[in-house]
Amino acid sequence: MQKRITIFDTIRGFTMISMAGFHACYDLAYLYGWDMPWFTQSVFQDIWRASISWVFLFIAGWMCTLSHNNIKRAAKYALAALVVWLATTLVSVDDSVNFGIIYCMAACTGIVALTDPVLKKISARWGMPLCLVLFALTWSIPKTTYPVPYLAWLGFPSPGFVSGDYYPIIPFIFMYLAGYFAAHIAQGIDKTVPSWAYANPLPALASLGRHALPFYLLHQPIILGILELVYSVR
């Protein structure tokens, strides 16, 4: 039985706590009207958001090289993305989540699963930096609108498209692939996982990181529930 790569569980655990903090600040600022200019009127919000989503995508790309069934992983992510879309559409607290981070992970995992034989022919030492360059070059593509309907999933939103969390395939497939190629670099010619990947310096965070998907699905309803409870008794 393959040992679990605990260092990524630890990183995920830390990132999940950061994500919960980010969404708590978002809710307080945009749903409860708190005056938080450091969050709403500065680049800090974008940096914080990127530090969460980019880590998730990079690690997911790395881990797909170790998965026995990436099609199954993609289907699990897709089901979770559907749940998020339904919940945010039916419960109108904020904009519904169309093509959010979980959708992106589902799409990227599915794409890699189907193209893995081709991707393996690309030198990882060239593939990783190339993907990072492509990520930077395509970063602004989904930040404008296009007079073409039904392509928001790819990265070309139409003028009427709205989403509370938007991570289309372009440019984020390239961050995912950067993780994929980084894994192949680290594994080397013999395809073994490096020893540092089994480090477990913070077991509590590693334990949290092993349950990233359920944590993602539940943390925002819990935060909103706590805030509603606090405000109802004030």
Q: What kind of region is each of these model predictions?
A:
Residues 1-234:
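Alpha-helical transmembrane segments and their immediate juxtamembrane cytosolic regions
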